[in-house]
UniProtKB/Swiss-Prot annotation:
PANTHER family: 2,5-DIKETO-D-GLUCONIC ACID REDUCTASE, NADP-DEPENDENT OXIDOREDUCTASE DOMAIN-CONTAINING PROTEIN. It comes from Mycolicibacterium smegmatis (strain ATCC 700084 / mc(2)155). It comes from the Bacteria. Its EC number is 1.1.1.-. Keywords: NADP, Oxidoreductase. Belongs to the aldo/keto reductase family. This is Aldo-keto reductase MSMEG_2407/MSMEI_2346.
Amino acid sequence: MTASHGQAAAIPTVTLNDDNTLPVVGIGVGELSDSEAERSVSAALEAGYRLIDTAAAYGNEAAVGRAIAASGIPRDEIYVTTKLATPDQGFTSSQAAARASLERLGLDYVDLYLIHWPGGDTSKYVDSWGGLMKVKEDGIARSIGVCNFGAEDLETIVSLTYFTPAVNQIELHPLLNQAALREVNAGYNIVTEAYGPLGVGRLLDHPAVTAIAEAHGRTAAQVLLRWSIQLGNVVISRSANPERIASNLDVFGFELTADEMETLNGLDDGTRFRPDPATYTGS
């Protein structure tokens, strides 16, 4: 990992399998209204975040684009991720959807374009992956990847297209630490990107988490984010509160001990707070 430049110099980056880079911490805007998303992204950029994560299905790409434009930060210092909605899957439709996302964002390219969900139709997501390969070739996206893909899904697209995703974004927190899938990702040199790192807030008052937080003089959220970073993940948190947004970026001035990591790893019980990708067909 290396440090990025400018205001966000303290944020390390990870190199993807296509030699592009991503900051290891980003802000997400899922389930935020337009006004909330715009305020959240503005606050995040001001705090020093440079990785912004949205999706067509969130319905707030235009708001994200407005916040980016208003920030005055050079485009090449910001990393923008958006995602292909399940109804838009398909070889041709995925390319059209990517261009529509660019238009809503008001950008010439995105840094990362992801298939949002497998969606339950193998042939459809394989065709979509072919579309994303064209999206990358055409310069619409610098890097391409997937969200919520299991080991079999990854094997399918890699074996059929001979092109490996740069990123697999998955639900990941101490109750669902995804050790097996992280190992599969690593075997393909795919970066694991963690969403839902705070367990939709339910882990913030977990006794094991709060005890570690007290030991370090940190917030529970900072401990949860730090745990994920130390596992080697890129981590995407979400908040509409500017103070929490700034606090959640302050995760590089301390390190969890091996025992603390083991304690948090030991909380894994398979609990999901988001849909199970193996059966989910929504967007």
